[in-house]
Amino acid sequence: MNFTLHIWRQECAHAKGHFETYQIDNISPDCSFLEMLDILNEQLITRSTPNSQLSTLNSPITHPVCFDNDCREGICGMCGLYINGRPHGNDDGITTCQLHMRKFKDGDEIWIEPWRAKAFPVIRDLVVDRSALDKIIQAGGYISTTTGGVPDANTIPIPKQDADMAMDAASCIGCGACVAACKNASAMLFVGAKVSHLALLPQGKVEAAERAKKMVCKMDELGFGSCTNTYACEAECPKLIKRQNISRLNRQWIEALLGRDSK
């Protein structure tokens, strides 16, 4: 398969970015998207050789394309590319590393950009600084407990419905696709998931109201936008986190402001 790639290149957060165009050929339909970028980078490194398959249409930058990745199994949340106007590309419920080239047509033009958000400054090319999400977790995304022996798993009975909802919320991998998809660059789905997976369980209910208040305040402080209920975040989330977590966060936030315990 042959593709024309339009890739965002930017030296740092303060530099002016631009698209560069590459023609890449003979890509297997079974390649993942990141493997295709690996092949591109190999050819960028060796493009001066006579047998290079890479055609560079406008390329003042010679270093390989920088992009985040780690596990390449859809678990770590490191990979995050805006592909043809969609976070993680043109499929549902997957991360970028799980996107395969067979989802495209031979000869397609593919536009590849980093996450766009004030809270996610560009480090280089397609790599952005998502440490703002970690700072939100540090503000309150935990439970306070006394260290010591580990209690038995069945010490505190938990209804299956609550356990299932908590598990669904806990599947958030913190990739930032919800922020990238949102026209306001809001992190409400991320914060809602992190608040919900603790508040739904007995161990997390004690600090539920204070947790919601701290995490929302930190989110606003870091420059994320407000939620206007378009739910693009839910549509693009690779782990299919539901918007009900946003509703639960709003409810706990209001209860915290009123000084009431979250239910």
Go through each PLM region and give its residues.
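Short, structured protein-protein interaction patches enriched in aromatics and acidic/basic residues
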Residues: L57, I61, V65-M78
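Ferredoxin-type iron-sulfur electron-transfer modules in oxidoreductases and energy-metabolism complexes
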Residues: C31-N51, S55-H63, I110-K263
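Short, contiguous acidic and Ser/Thr-rich linear segments
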Residues: E20-S32
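Glycine-rich phosphate/adenylate-binding loop and adjacent beta-alpha elements
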Residues: I83-G107, I112
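Residues in well-ordered beta-strands of folded domains
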Residues: H6-W8, D25, Q98-H100, W111-W115
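Eukaryote-biased recognition of intrinsically disordered, low-complexity regulatory segments
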Residues: M1-Q23
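Functionalized membrane-embedded alpha-helices
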Residues: I75, L81-I83, C233
